């Protein structure tokens, strides 16, 4: 009877220990300290603005906006250890210490895909920036893929946020209102019988020149000149080359290396209804 009692006590202790262990799932927290916290503008051009915050031993948080017709913003949570399976991270905004008793806010759920960083779309990204501006700490909670006993919390520290955020918003306000995709294929039209661009094409060419000044990744620019069917064929072909060469000269003055630009004149060949034009095509990696 005494042996049965000992077995019962041992079993009860084991079950209690197991229950206690399950309830005490560890939370690994990553956050920059007050001394470490920094918000840096790591890209500042008319094509790209990028605000970055390093989370020691975890990775970094990156807000990015690119030149485009529409206002855009993307958030990326870069992780040193990428997800090993699909899961969700709960995004909460936690109040600062000087606002005790205030509950955290549920901001969103972020999909975590295998071997990819986490990303959030424009609306949620702006919400995170607004929370940081008010002194809150957006925090990402998820189950650890590499340990069944742990959860992870990655926290953005709002200390030193205002100066970086102000520089970022200034940069975003100065982004070009068009992207590479908007100008990579452009048809420039001419006044009849001359090498003068129409007003709209002049404006478009100015945009292209401005873009080319800031994008060193442009590999090639192809210019194809065409005329209408009025006048002799030889004269039209020469006019089409002259038009394309004039565009090439304009691009050279904008800083585009001559070896990157290829010129072809087709005159009235490949004729279409409105054929007085130069077709400009750009390529990059």
Please give the residue ranges for each predicted region:
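Bacterial N-terminal signal peptides that target proteins for export
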Residues: 1-8
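N-terminal signal peptide c-region/cleavage motif recognized by signal peptidases
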Residues: 17-19
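An ectodomain-focused feature that recognizes extracytoplasmic/extracellular
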Residues: 23-86
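Extended low-complexity, serine/threonine- and proline-enriched intrinsically disordered segments
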Residues: 74-106
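Short, solvent-exposed, Trp/other aromatic-anchored flexible loops in extracytoplasmic proteins
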Residues: 114-133
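Second-shell loop/turn segments in exported
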Residues: 115-119, 190-198, 233-237
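Periplasmic peptidoglycan-binding/tethering modules of Gram-negative envelope proteins
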Residues: 137-219, 285
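Periplasmic OmpA-like peptidoglycan-binding domain that tethers envelope proteins to the cell wall
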Residues: 227-285
């Amino acid at each position: 009877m005494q042996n049965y009692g000992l077995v019962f006590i041992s079993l009860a202790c084991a079950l209690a220990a197991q229950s206690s262990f399950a309830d005490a799932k560890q939370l690994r927290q990553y956050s920059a300290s007050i001394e470490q916290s920094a918000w840096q503008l790591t890209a500042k051009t008319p094509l790209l603005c990028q605000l970055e915050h390093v989370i020691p031993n975890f990775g970094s948080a990156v807000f990015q906006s690119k030149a485009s017709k529409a206002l855009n913003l993307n958030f990326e949570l870069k992780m040193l250890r990428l997800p090993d399976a699909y899961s969700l991270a709960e995004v909460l905004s936690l109040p600062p210490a000087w606002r005790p008793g205030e509950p955290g806010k549920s901001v969103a759920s972020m999909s975590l895909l295998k071997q990819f960083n986490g990303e959030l779309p424009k609306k949620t990204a702006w919400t995170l920036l607004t929370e940081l501006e008010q002194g809150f700490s957006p925090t990402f909670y998820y189950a650890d893929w590499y340990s069944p006993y742990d959860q992870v919390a990655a926290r953005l520290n709002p200390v030193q946020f205002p100066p970086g955020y102000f520089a970022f918003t200034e940069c975003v306000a100065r982004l070009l209102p068009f992207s590479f995709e908007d100008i990579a294929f452009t048809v420039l039209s001419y006044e009849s019988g001359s090498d003068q661009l129409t007003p709209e094409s002049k404006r478009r060419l100015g945009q292209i020149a401005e873009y080319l000044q800031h994008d060193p990744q442009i590999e090639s620019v192809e210019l194809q000149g065409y005329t209408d069917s009025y006048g002799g064929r030889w004269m039209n072909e020469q006019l089409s080359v002259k038009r394309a060469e004039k565009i090439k000269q304009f691009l050279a003055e904008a800083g585009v290396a001559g070896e990157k630009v290829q010129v072809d004149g087709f005159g009235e060949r490949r004729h279409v209804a409105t054929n007085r034009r130069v077709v400009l095509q750009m390529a990059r990696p």
